[in-house]
């Protein structure tokens, strides 16, 4: 069994189909099919149930996926260990909430990359649930999420304190009236949905139309145009507030607080690049 076989198996398990895995790996589909079949013959067990809807893991496949995740992470860490010489260097895979990536992180990472030019930084965005799953599967080294998160295997550093507000194109209006407009969410999943449901319940506003968008810019533009209202961090609204028709409205005190934490696996091999990242985060004015 080679590491390449495990990467292919991991991709098929995550994507749920041969074609999607082949596309993500830039392989031809027949090659992926053959490698999975060879792996099953080698292990003398079925790893996937094959249906018209795609591929799902058998119990044996689920066990192998856990081992494959760890083995591939160990290989990744071995590569980083071999590169650990001199100044911080090598790959650093970071995930972030889109609002944090737009508002809090540009200056921080500009200074970090200037100080450590040999580090190969990659920054991807997503919602808290997706980013946590990427961390648990060793697909990211660390991520900025709404915290705290309840996973024993994760280390967490509180880095930013935020205030949740309601963004609208109306300067004035009661919270109850504003909440009767359509609510604009991130399409990938909104980390505040439970809190928003509680706000609607508190204000006696029935659930109504939801419109989903893919980016923060799109949500801000839609709010300005009067398409609806959106629950966003105050810093994100202020970041765009030089634009016309964009106003923030305070929420009841019990719904305002938001904490952004930086999370990573407890057993992650801490390269000098990662340690310097942690040191920088802990030194931030809002850090702890």
Swiss-Prot record:
DNA-binding region: 18-37
Annotated HTH lysR-type domain residues: 1-58
UniProt keyword terms in alphabetical order: Cell cycle, Cell division, Cytoplasm, DNA-binding, Septation, Transcription, Transcription regulation
Location of this chain's protein in the cell: Cytoplasm
GO biological process: division septum assembly
PROSITE patterns: HTH_LYSR
Annotated disulfide bonds: none
Entry's transmembrane regions: none
GO cellular component, one term: cytoplasm
InterPro entries: LysR_subst-bd (IPR005119), Tscrpt_reg_HTH_LysR (IPR000847), WH-like_DNA-bd_sf (IPR036388), WH_DNA-bd_sf (IPR036390)
Function field: Regulates expression of the cell division protein ftsW, and is essential for cell viability during stationary phase.
Record PANTHER family: HTH-TYPE TRANSCRIPTIONAL REGULATOR (PTHR30126), HTH-TYPE TRANSCRIPTIONAL REGULATOR GLTR (PTHR30126:SF40)
Entry's family note: Belongs to the LysR transcriptional regulatory family.
Entry protein name: HTH-type transcriptional regulator YofA
Source organism phylogeny: Bacteria, Bacillati, Bacillota, Bacilli, Bacillales
Gene responsible for this protein: yofA
């Amino acid at each position: 069994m080679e590491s390449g076989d495990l990467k292919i198996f991991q991709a098929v398990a995550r994507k749920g189909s041969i074609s999607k895995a082949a596309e993500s790996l830039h392989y031809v589909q027949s090659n992926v099919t053959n490698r999975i079949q060879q792996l099953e013959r080698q292990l003398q067990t079925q790893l996937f149930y094959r249906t018209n809807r795609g591929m799902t893991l058998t119990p044996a496949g689920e066990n192998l996926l856990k081992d494959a995740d760890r083995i591939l992470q160990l290989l990744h860490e071995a590569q980083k260990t071999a590169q650990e010489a001199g100044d911080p260097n090598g790959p650093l895979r970071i995930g972030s909430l889109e609002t944090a990536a737009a508002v809090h992180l540009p200056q921080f990472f500009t200074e970090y990359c200037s100080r450590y030019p040999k580090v190969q930084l990659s920054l991807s965005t997503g919602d808290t649930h997706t980013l946590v799953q990427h961390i648990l599967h060793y697909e990211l080294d660390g991520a900025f999420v709404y915290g705290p998160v309840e996973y024993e295997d994760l280390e967490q550093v509180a880095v930013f304190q935020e205030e949740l507000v309601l963004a609208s194109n109306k300067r004035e209006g009661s919270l109850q009236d504003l909440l009767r407009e359509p609510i604009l969410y991130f399409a990938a999943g909104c980390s505040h949905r439970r809190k928003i449901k509680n706000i609607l319940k508190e204000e006696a506003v029935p659930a109504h139309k939801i419109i989903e968008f893919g980016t923060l810019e799109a949500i801000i533009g839609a709010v300005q145009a009067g398409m609806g209202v959106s629950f966003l961090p105050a810093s994100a609204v202020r970041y765009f507030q030089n634009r016309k028709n964009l106003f923030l409205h305070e929420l009841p005190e019990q719904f305002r607080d938001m904490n952004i934490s930086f999370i990573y696996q407890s057993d992650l091999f801490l390269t000098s690049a990662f340690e310097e990242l942690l040191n920088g985060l802990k030194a931030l004015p809002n850090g702890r």
